[in-house]
Regions:
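Short beta-strand/loop segment that forms part of the nucleotide-sugar
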Residues: 1-5, 26-30
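Short aromatic/hydrophobic "clamp" motif used to bind/position activated sugar donors
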Residues: 51
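Non-catalytic, C-terminal membrane-associated alpha-helical segments of glycosyltransferases
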Residues: 184-191, 198, 202-278
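Conserved donor NDP-sugar-binding/catalytic core segment of glycosyltransferases
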Residues: 63-94
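Glycine-rich, basic loop-to-helix element that forms the pyrophosphate-binding segment
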Residues: 30-46
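Short, flexible, basic/aromatic active-site loop/helix in glycosyltransferases
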Residues: 82, 96-114
Length: 278
């Protein structure tokens, strides 16, 4: 469990949980705020053959570990995500993945949401090859989101399959019940995705196609075409605007000297000799 700079009694609560648990729990303190920092801290100290990333507002379904063991029985070298359901039916149906059929990623679909970061798995050898999460992305970072999508794009560029399976379920208690909250999150996701377009312009130019397809859909929406999400009344236009904003923000970060190498080889080397937690 990673405590990502909490200022309340989280550390004491984690210690209580660890002491009462029937399995070994390693508590990792990561003072730098940001989801990507937390993911990297956990990944660096993980001991298992298979890494499982979930979020702090998610509950793992009872069959999860059995599903996980079955899917990795053959030692697949993939990035694999599972179903994400609402943890509370009162929350709005956003940041969920309910497809009932298995899927394999291709550039014909946008990678955002194909596998959600709150339910993403891979073998440690795969993580070693891809490297660390880009800490400029994700909640609490300048680019606000898309650290998981960036990871999928990097995996695909390396020839690592990205798969979705309709089991391996987690329940997401995101707590958002007002449309305004979903609109803010929608814009945040779009900002991160715009940054990805510029970051991967050379290695994944197909991302730009999705931007132009969104522009086309936005123009059609103006002429009484369908919205991006009719049920939640989410428009294509904020996606266009925030994609451009995200690309501009990424450019500023790069020009300011904060760019990180995509492969991050020093982390890939570190995963093979994982640091043991306290």
């Amino acid at each position: 469990m990673v405590d990502n700079g909490s200022t309340d009694a989280t550390q004491d609560e984690l210690r209580r949980i660890a002491a009462a648990s029937g399995v070994t729990i390693t508590i990792v303190m990561e003072g730098r705020p940001g989801l990507a920092f937390a993911r990297n801290a956990g990944m660096q100290r993980a001991r298992g053959r298979v890494l499982v990333f979930i979020d702090d507002d998610c509950e793992v379904g009872r069959p999860y570990l059995g599903d996980l063991q079955r899917h990795y029985a053959k030692g697949d070298r993939v990035v694999r995500g599972g179903r994400v359901e609402l943890g509370n039916p009162g929350d709005l149906p956003f940041t969920v993945k309910r497809s009932p059929v298995p899927e394999v990623f291709t550039p014909g679909v946008h990678p955002g949401g194909f596998v959600l970061g709150c339910n993403m798995t891979m073998q440690s050898e795969v993580a070693a090859r891809i490297g660390r999460f880009d800490e400029r992305f994700g909640a609490g970072a300048p680019l606000q989101s898309a650290e998981d999508t960036d990871y999928l794009v990097r995996a695909y560029a390396l020839g690592i399959p990205v798969e979705y399976v309709p089991d391996m379920t987690v329940y997401h208690h995101h707590g958002r019940r007002e449309r305004a909250e979903i609109e803010r999150l929608h814009r945040s996701y779009s900002l991160g995705n715009g940054a990805l377009c510029l970051k991967h312009l050379v290695k994944a130019p197909w991302l730009v196609k999705h931007f132009f397809w969104t522009v086309r859909s936005a123009m059609a929406e103006t002429l009484f075409g369908p919205r991006f999400d009719p049920d939640l009344q989410l428009s294509h236009w904020p996606i266009v605007l925030m994609n451009l904003t995200g690309a501009a923000r990424f450019a500023r970060l790069w020009l300011a000297g904060r760019a990180m190498p995509t492969e991050l080889p020093e982390v890939g080397e570190a995963v093979s000799r994982l640091e043991r937690g306290p």
